[in-house]
């Protein structure tokens, strides 16, 4: 029964993550396909460059909600009794981590857009908000400061997700936070960093687009 529930959590969370809010908002608001502009991604950064701040903020918020909703759904499926310590508690944490990662995977490889979406940053933070708000807030602040000081959204995104992981290390080792939270941060930050590999190459070559540059 537990395996069936975990499978349900993964499938539903992946579908939630696959909802392409960047594509939907751009198509409805400006009758354009966001994938034909800029990076070709459906995330908030490309929406910002193409449609402006209001649309980008809406998309980022909706993408965050996807991640948080997936983690919340895992809690509902496993059951409230799993909040107790022991085997059920471990099952809940495992399910929540799976849900968050499945949502991130859905955002990156959405089934509705031939498996080409965004880079998963906002959805990752949505899952982190539901799992460990303090790490999400810290990582979000690092992201904003990093992007603001450097002018590069990609650099801010990478430092933000790594920052969330960096905070979870002492929280786990010293304060006794669940190891599963750190596992989520490790896998999520690694995946997002890999998805930014082209940006990293451009950063090193001095050719990365600035945050305020319009998409072409």
From Swiss-Prot:
First-tier enzyme category under EC: transferase
Signal peptide (from-to): none
Domain of life the protein comes from: Bacteria
Keyword Disulfide bond: no
Topological category with respect to the lipid bilayer: Multi-pass membrane protein
GO MF entry, a single one: acyl-phosphate glycerol-3-phosphate acyltransferase activity
Matches recorded under InterPro entries: G3P_acylTferase_PlsY
Intracellular or extracellular location(s): Cell membrane
Catalyzed reactions per annotation: an acyl phosphate + sn-glycerol 3-phosphate = a 1-acyl-sn-glycero-3-phosphate + phosphate
Cellular component per GO, a single term: plasma membrane
Quaternary context: Probably interacts with PlsX.
UniProt xrefs under NCBIfam families: glycerol-3-phosphate 1-O-acyltransferase PlsY (TIGR00023)
Family: Belongs to the PlsY family.
Chain's role: Catalyzes the transfer of an acyl group from acyl-phosphate (acyl-PO(4)) to glycerol-3-phosphate (G3P) to form lysophosphatidic acid (LPA). This enzyme utilizes acyl-phosphate as fatty acyl donor, but not acyl-CoA or acyl-ACP.
Name of this protein: Glycerol-3-phosphate acyltransferase 3
């Amino acid at each position: 029964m537990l395996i069936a529930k975990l499978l349900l959590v993964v499938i539903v969370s992946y579908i939630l993550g696959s909802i392409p809010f960047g594509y939907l908002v751009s198509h409805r608001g400006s009758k354009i396909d966001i994938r034909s502009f800029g990076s070709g991604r459906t995330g908030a950064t490309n929406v910002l460059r193409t449609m402006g701040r209001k649309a980008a903020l809406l998309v980022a918020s909706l993408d965050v909600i996807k991640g948080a909703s997936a983690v919340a759904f895992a809690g509902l499926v496993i059951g409230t009794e799993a909040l107790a310590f022991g085997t059920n508690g471990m099952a809940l944490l495992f399910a929540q981590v799976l849900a968050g990662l499945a949502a991130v995977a859905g955002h990156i490889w959405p089934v509705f857009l031939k498996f080409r979406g965004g880079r998963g940053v906002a959805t990752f933070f949505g899952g982190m908000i539901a799992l460990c708000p303090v790490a999400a807030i810290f990582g979000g602040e690092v992201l904003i400061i990093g992007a603001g000081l450097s002018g590069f959204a990609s650099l801010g995104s990478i430092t933000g997700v790594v920052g969330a992981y960096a905070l979870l290390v002492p929280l786990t080792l010293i304060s006794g936070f669940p190891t599963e939270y750190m596992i989520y941060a490790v896998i999520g930050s690694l995946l997002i960093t890999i998805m930014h590999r082209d940006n990293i190459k451009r950063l090193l070559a001095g050719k990365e687009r600035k945050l305020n540059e319009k998409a072409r």
